[in-house]
A protein has these predicted regions:
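HDAC/HDAC-like amidohydrolase catalytic core signature
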Residues: 1-190, 195-240
Length: 240
């Protein structure tokens, strides 16, 4: 089996994140990818470098205004006197339908579910290569491979159509599933993780062509807290 990854995924350095009211060192560091890659190689996986697949497969899942924010937020943030090193929200709207704000500070709150997905100098580069890694692995399957391992960093299952969170920015599995839809009528995403894949669920909640299953700890006590309950069964065409 091939393991797909790109070295530029290591450029993203989130620094710290807010947990239990305190800023702590972010565990989603570049070294995490090294350990996963070493494990994949030890298991016999053959490394393959992905191509730049452009913005079309990413834009098929994520909104244009959100992608614009992710790409340019850091350079806009740096113009603020006394701002932190990375884009980090400090206010969140209780009603997102009231309109789209102009300030990058307000946009950070609009597009970030929490303070665990900061955007720093090289984040956008790594974010894109992580998504292209998922696209490339999906293309390998479409070309006839039985399986492929997309080593995606940053991860993606907490990323919504227009919102980051939980170390995630672009929803890599959702992007890959959409690519696979070119040749398959229905696709399934099985998400096994301590935390519920709330972003993935949200993206396909009203669709019947991608089936999402998340096996996770009880959100009554575990992040993401507000999603992942047994009564969440989809809506409209996606209800089941």
């Amino acid at each position: 089996m091939k393991v797909v990854y790109h070295g530029d995924q290591k450029k993203h350095y989130p620094g710290q994140f807010l947990v239990n009211g305190r800023f702590r060192p972010n565990p989603e560091l570049p070294e995490r990818m090294d350990r996963l890659l070493d494990g994949a190689k030890a298991a016999g996986c053959v490394p393959e470098t992905p191509e730049n697949h452009g913005m079309a497969p990413i834009g098929a899942i994520h909104s244009a205004v959100y992608l614009e924010f992710l790409e340019h937020a850091n350079e806009r943030w740096k113009r603020i006197d006394g701002a932190a090193d990375a884009v980090t929200p400090n206010v969140h709207p209780d009603r997102r339908e009231v309109g789209y704000p102009a300030s990058v500070v307000a946009q950070a709150g609009y597009h970030m579910a929490d303070a665990a997905a900061p955007v720093s100098d090289h984040s956008w580069t790594s974010i894109c290569w992580s998504a292209w890694t998922a696209v490339h692995a999906a293309e390998l399957i479409l070309d006839g491979a039985d399986s492929a391992y997309a080593l995606c960093r940053p991860p993606g299952h907490h990323a919504f159509n227009d919102m980051a969170g939980g170390f995630c920015y672009l929803n890599n599995s959702a992007i890959a599933a959409q690519v696979l839809r070119r040749a398959h009528g229905r696709v399934a995403i099985l998400d096994v993780d301590l935390h519920h894949g709330n972003g993935t669920q949200s993206i396909f909640y009203s669709r019947n062509d991608v089936f999402t299953v998340s096996i996770h700890a009880d959100p009554l006590r575990f992040y993401p807290f507000f999603w992942g309950y047994s009564n969440e069964r989809g809506e409209g065409a996606g209800q089941g």
